[in-house]
């Protein structure tokens, strides 16, 4: 009887350890996913600020000096950053 109870308790302990390992893995992945999303959101905000400043500066430069080449380069950069931000948004949504 004693060996049966010992074996049964050992089996219960093994199952509990597996469940705790699975729970730890799930929690770790959830925390990492949230940090990745937070990093993407902060990068999105920072890139949006930089892009808006680039657009404002390029418009100011166009009005002040009528420099069409600079405006073209800065607007091309802004469009490129918006495309990259959209692709990052798609990737972050596909992670969830």
UniProtKB/Swiss-Prot annotation:
GO terms for cellular component: host cell cytoplasm; membrane; virion membrane. It is found in: Virion membrane; Host cytoplasm. Induction: Expressed in the early phase of the viral replicative cycle. The keyword Transmembrane helix applies. Its main location: virion. Keywords: Early protein, Host cytoplasm, Membrane, Transmembrane, Transmembrane helix, Virion. The keyword Plastid does not apply. It holds the Pfam family Chordopox_L2. The chain crosses the membrane at residues 36-56, 71-91. It comes from the Viruses. It is a multi-pass membrane protein. Belongs to the chordopoxvirinae L2 family. Early protein involved in early virion morphogenesis. Participates in the formation and elongation of crescent-shaped membrane precursors of immature virions in cytoplasmic factories. This is Protein FPV129. It comes from Fowlpox virus (strain NVSL).
